[in-house]
From Swiss-Prot:
GO molecular function: glutathione peroxidase activity; peroxidase activity
Protein source organism: Homo sapiens (Human)
Any one Gene Ontology cellular component term annotated for this protein: membrane
Protein name in the entry: Probable glutathione peroxidase 8
Keywords: Acetylation, Membrane, Oxidoreductase, Peroxidase, Transmembrane, Transmembrane helix
């Protein structure tokens, strides 16, 4: 019996090498494209474009506050600054809100572990003890990789990261951060900037009529 003749593989040779190179290029291109879709999300340029959770854990779109002035604050119940700040925030919200202005409070336990309560209890505590009527959202993290995206937007825009409770970020009707204040700064310092922005909102609404 004669041995079988050895035949050369058809895929060997220059054409096969070219095909392999082209296939590698295509695979690399597809892989890079998929990675871009996964990691390169469109840049959000407005605070009001985010969604957050309310104190009961329900999703809330911040779009509802677009067109108003907002003072966004990281709050805490067991801080030496709690009384003064909650009362001051209540005063501002009563004076300028709710049609043209709102305080938006985000509880956080990362600064001195001053907010150990669950979100619902934080809201109840603030309403009962200080009579606040402004929105109090779900407890969040601000620092680290688990930082709430909406609040991180404020931090990144202002280049100012909170170092304690009750940092305040003033957001204009378009969702841009225009100013920030540290917790020890009195309400009297904050009021003129809020008043100026609210005045602009009122004038614009009259012009649009």
């Amino acid at each position: 019996m004669e041995p079988l003749a050895a035949y050369p593989l058809k895929c060997s040779g220059p054409r096969a090498k070219v095909f392999a190179v082209l296939l590698s290029i295509v695979l690399c291109t597809v892989t890079l494209f998929l990675l871009q879709l996964k990691f390169l999300k469109p840049k959000i340029n407005s605070f009001y474009a985010f969604e957050v959770k309310d104190a009961k854990g329900r999703t809330v779109s911040l779009e509802k506050y677009k067109g108003k002035v907002s003072l966004v604050v990281n709050v805490a119940s067991d801080c030496q600054l709690t009384d003064r700040n909650y009362l001051g925030l209540k005063e501002l919200h009563k004076e300028f809100g709710p049609s043209h202005f709102s305080v938006l409070a985000f509880p956080c336990n990362q600064f001195g572990e001053s907010e150990p309560r669950p979100s619902k209890e934080v809201e109840s505590f603030a309403r009962k003890n200080y009579g606040v009527t402004f929105p109090i959202f779900h407890k969040i993290k601000i620092l680290g990789s688990e930082g709430e995206p909406a609040f991180r937007f404020l931090v990144d825009s202002s280049k100012k990261e909170p170092r304690w409770n009750f940092w305040k970020y003033l957001v204009n009707p378009e969702g841009q951060v225009v100013k920030f204040w540290k917790p020890e700064e009195p309400i009297e310092v904050i009021r003129p900037d809020i008043a100026a922005l609210v005045r602009q909102v009122i004038i614009k609404k009259k012009e649009d009529l």
